[in-house]
Swiss-Prot record:
Belongs to the EPS8 family. Transmembrane segments: none annotated. It is found in: Cytoplasm. Keywords: Cytoplasm, Phosphoprotein, SH3 domain. Residues 28-155 form the PTB domain. One of its GO terms (cellular component) is cytoplasm. InterPro entries: EPS8-like, EPS8_2nd, EPS8_PTB, Eps8_SH3, PH-like_dom_sf, PTB, SAM/pointed_sf, SAM_3. This is Epidermal growth factor receptor kinase substrate 8-like protein 3. The gene is Eps8l3. Detected in embryonic gut. Detected in adult testis, placenta, adrenal gland and intestine. The lineage of its organism: Eukaryota, Metazoa, Chordata, Craniata, Vertebrata. The modification Phosphoserine is found at residue 238. It comes from Mus musculus (Mouse). PANTHER family: EPIDERMAL GROWTH FACTOR RECEPTOR KINASE SUBSTRATE 8-LIKE PROTEIN 3 (PTHR12287:SF22), EPIDERMAL GROWTH FACTOR RECEPTOR KINASE SUBSTRATE EPS8-RELATED PROTEIN (PTHR12287). GO terms for biological process: regulation of hair cycle. It holds the Pfam family EPS8_2nd.
Length: 600
């Protein structure tokens, strides 16, 4: 057989190239899905917040990842199972709001961030992928190219191709402009926030101008746009008492397990003996009352709230592992529940923002679908709840156990021995944070001296042992080491005045007498601790950090910042930069902000 001529080879190559170029784009790469964060929650408002949350979870070993295929086909972004090729999730390409890359920010060194509008839903979510086989930058370029092709090929005037059958909304009349989103690492640039979530069909995409569809600008939720912000929290947080919360969680989980065991016993009996239906009112076919189901659903919601509070303190079994076990049990209970819509009717207790964050960060796609199917009373935190406030939830347990009084309400002598397992923070006493000062008799103590400084006596000066944060206009925020003048010590809460002339009530047990030999009415130390102000220079910030006894690593990390930069840092940024001391840094910064009158 003779060798083909050069011209024949060229023509065959040309034909092959043209056929390949005319084929629809099919992009498929293996990636590691790290997490999906719904934007607009209390802590995650923009894509870079999702990255910060990932960094926090990575530092704590709480990331639950999954290998999968990221595929672009027929105008859709598909997430497929590696082995079965089952579709785990999918998003329309024109619902992609932003594509970004974060390199070498944590143990995951090549992160692709894709922010999408979920089809038919009001929420906007950011998906984070580790791109090991194909770099995140290359994958971003491929996705942007696929998006451009999809928008260029879309027919005009409302005619859509078969791949759009699953989409309910009208098509765009013009391409979505592709622009580079701001880098995720820009922490101190002006904030870009997503607008408040609206129903998918509230505004037709046909009326949206190209500029408003840009990938780069996310209006602040505080900008005037006719949206009414949710009301402030209507309930005060419970006192911090991790050991008590662990005890409550153990009893809650045991009751959930007992109820599931009861269902399994009934199921086993029914498999051998056919039961009659509807024998008693308000009883299901398995003989368990509706009230028992409601009680179990309430305890499941309570368990999520407790896991959200304890997530950072858990050691042997992580919070995501507990969530997975609870969802397995919940799935079984739902399969036995005679009323499909019963969980949606269980309003109290509403989930806390921390519980919502935990579920959004660790649920698998099937679990996430199950969670969302339970209704808004399960997926909306109490901070975002717009309905009537439900009654407080007081659980009752099968064994008659009652939730003990918080340790923060116990006498001070019992609190010195309280410690948190696994906590590296400096120990501090817990005061009755949920009982603001008032003149009720319960705040009086006959053992306290009933005296107040008279005009003829020298003012009584005392030093603050532990910082205290005011919660109303009657109380006074004080910092550790501060010298105060005691004006009234006739009750458990003393009236004091600071050096700035501000007065207010604080717990008496956070004060101690000045050291012996210190002149009363004057500061004992000659050295004046440096103040942190918005105008503070890096050397002043460094001096303030050192005076607050922060670690050398923290001083070196934060000492290069201006005062304005440090005072405007958010908790997530502090947690990322200084994970060990972030809570204490945040507490001290909050005290400084209040002294400066900052609303941040």
């Amino acid at each position: 057989m003779s060798r083909p001529s050069s011209r024949a080879i060229y023509l065959h190559r040309k034909e092959y190239s043209q056929s390949m170029a005319s084929e629809p784009t099919l992009l498929q790469h293996r990636v590691e899905h790290l997490m999906t964060c719904k934007l607009g929650t209390q802590r995650v408002r923009e894509p870079k917040d999702a990255l910060q949350k990932l960094q926090e979870m990575d530092a704590q070993g709480r990331v639950w990842s999954q290998d999968l295929f990221l595929q672009v086909r027929d105008g859709w972004l598909h997430l497929l199972d590696i082995e079965t090729k089952e579709e785990l999730d999918s998003y329309r390409l024109d619902n992609i709001k932003a594509i970004d890359v974060a390199l070498n920010t944590c143990s995951y060194n090549s992160i692709l961030s894709v922010t999408v509008q979920e089809s038919g839903l009001p929420g906007i979510s950011t998906l984070l992928f580790q791109c090991q086989e194909v770099g995140a930058e290359q994958l971003r370029t491929s996705l942007q190219k696929a998006l451009e092709e999809e928008l260029e090929e879309r027919p005009r005037f409302g005619v859509h191709h078969p791949s759009q059958d699953r989409w309910k909304g009208p098509p765009l009349e013009r391409p979505l402009p592709i622009q580079q989103a701001p880098p995720l690492e820009q922490r101190f640039s002006p904030e870009h926030r997503f607008p408040p979530e609206q129903p998918h069909n509230m505004t037709s995409e046909r009326s949206i101008s190209p500029s408003s569809r840009s990938l780069t600008h996310y209006p602040s939720a505080r900008e005037p746009n006719g949206f009414t912000l949710p009301p402030p929290p209507r309930r005060a947080p419970s006192p911090e008492d991790p050991e008590r919360d662990e005890e409550v969680l153990n009893h809650v989980l045991r009751d959930i397990e007992l109820f599931a065991g009861k269902l399994k016993e009934v199921q086993a009996r029914n498999s051998h003996k056919k039961t009659k239906l509807g024998r008693k009112k308000k009883k299901s076919k398995n003989g368990i009352t509706q009230a028992e189901y409601i009680d179990c659903f309430q305890k499941i919601k309570l368990s999520f709230n407790l896991l959200g509070k304890l997530a950072l303190r858990m050691q042997e079994t992580s919070a995501p592992e507990f969530v997975g076990l609870i969802f397995q049990t919940l799935k079984f209970i739902l399969s036995q529940c005679p009323e499909a819509g019963l969980p949606a009717k269980v309003i109290s207790p509403l989930l806390t923002p921390k519980a919502i964050d935990l579920l959004q960060s660790c649920l698998s796609p099937p679990e996430d679908t199950l969670w969302k199917s339970l209704g808004t009373s399960w997926t909306t935190s109490w901070a975002d709840w717009t309905g009537s406030e439900p009654p407080p939830y007081q659980p009752t347990f099968y064994d008659g156990w009652q939730i003990p009084q918080p340790r923060s309400m116990m006498p001070i002598t019992n609190q010195d021995s309280i410690s948190l397992r696994g906590s590296r923070m400096r120990s501090s006493l817990h005061f009755p944070r949920d009982e603001p000062y008032n003149h009720n008799p319960e705040y009086e103590d006959s053992n306290l001296p009933l005296s107040s400084p008279s005009p003829g006596r020298a003012a009584l000066k005392m030093q603050v042992l532990y910082e205290f944060e005011a919660r109303n206009a009657q109380e006074l925020t004080v910092a550790q080491g501060e010298i105060l003048e005691v004006l009234d010590q006739s009750k458990r809460w003393w009236l004091v005045k600071n050096e700035a002339g501000l007065t207010g009530y604080i717990p008496s047990n956070i004060l101690e007498p000045l050291p012996a030999g210190a002149p009363r009415g004057h500061r004992q130390p000659s050295f004046r601790a440096p103040m942190l102000r918005l105008s503070s220079k890096p050397e002043e910030v460094t001096a303030w950090l050192q005076a607050e006894n922060f670690s050398t690593v923290t001083v070196r990390t934060l000492g290069s910042l201006m005062g304005s930069q440090l005072l405007h840092m958010r908790p997530g940024e502090l947690q990322m930069l200084c994970p060990q001391e972030a809570p204490r840094i945040q507490a001290r910064l909050d005290a400084v902000r209040r002294m400066l009158g900052m609303t941040h």
